[in-house]
Amino acid sequence: MERTELLKPRTLADLIRILHELFAGDEVNVEEVQAVLEAYESNPAEWALYAKFDQYRYTRNLVDQGNGKFNLMILCWGEGHGSSIHDHTDSHCFLKLLQGNLKETLFDWPDKKSNEMIKKSERTLRENQCAYINDSIGLHRVENVSHTEPAVSLHLYSPPFDTCHAFDQRTGHKNKVTMTFHSKFGIRTPFTTSGSLENN
């Protein structure tokens, strides 16, 4: 879908409406989606409803299901919380910082031998900055390294997925994990005792 003029979302609801338009077809224009996410100025009054924290781990909070084409969610990172090294199950992954800072570390895919994984790059994402990754780029880990400030990020995955692989940095060994939502549409999901691992 060609855009002669990029639409600037004024609100989170506006952003969601534009994303539905961008994902109406079968093709994903990565640059266009990223530009729209970057154009949205974070406003806590708009996303606070979805920002549900947990004392012990970061949380995944579903905002919109994108008519089956994408999942839009808000991840809440308490002080010192981080993800495992993980893949994205052949999906597009867009990330936008809404509050605070997050450290993203990229890794190469491990080789067949049992060796320590190779770090490709590392960067700090700040409020309103965006990032993009897919499995052809590599694997990543996302962390809130602050001991005093929480962080909140907006994530879009297309197509949606509910399992991925988590990797051991020391050996490259991978495990398949199931991801759960801490809340859906602002409502806390029922507590489950399953062994699922929340990833982003």
UniProtKB/Swiss-Prot annotation:
GO terms for molecular function: cysteine dioxygenase activity; ferrous iron binding; nickel cation binding; zinc ion binding. Induction: By increase of sulfur amino acid intake. Catalyzes the oxidation of cysteine to cysteine sulfinic acid with addition of molecular dioxygen. There is a cross-link at C93-Y157 (3'-(S-cysteinyl)-tyrosine (Cys-Tyr)). InterPro entries: CDO_1, RmlC-like_jellyroll, RmlC_Cupin_sf. The thioether cross-link between Cys-93 and Tyr-157 plays a structural role through stabilizing the Fe(2+) ion, and prevents the production of highly damaging free hydroxyl radicals by holding the oxygen radical via hydroxyl hydrogen. It is an enzyme of class 1 (oxidoreductase). Binds 1 Fe cation per subunit. Ni(2+) and Zn(2+) can be used to a lesser extent. It catalyses: L-cysteine + O2 = 3-sulfino-L-alanine + H(+). Keywords: Dioxygenase, Iron, Metal-binding, Oxidoreductase, Thioether bond. Its cofactor is Fe cation; Ni(2+); Zn(2+). This is Cysteine dioxygenase type 1. GO terms for biological process: cysteine metabolic process; L-cysteine catabolic process; L-cysteine metabolic process; lactation; response to amino acid; response to azide; response to cAMP; response to ethanol. Fe cation binds at H86, H88, H140. Monomer. Its EC number is 1.13.11.20. The keyword Oxidoreductase applies. Pathway: Organosulfur biosynthesis; taurine biosynthesis; hypotaurine from L-cysteine: step 1/2. It holds the Pfam family CDO_I. One of its GO terms (cellular component) is cytosol. Highest levels in liver. Significant expression also in kidney, lung and brain. Transmembrane segments: none annotated.
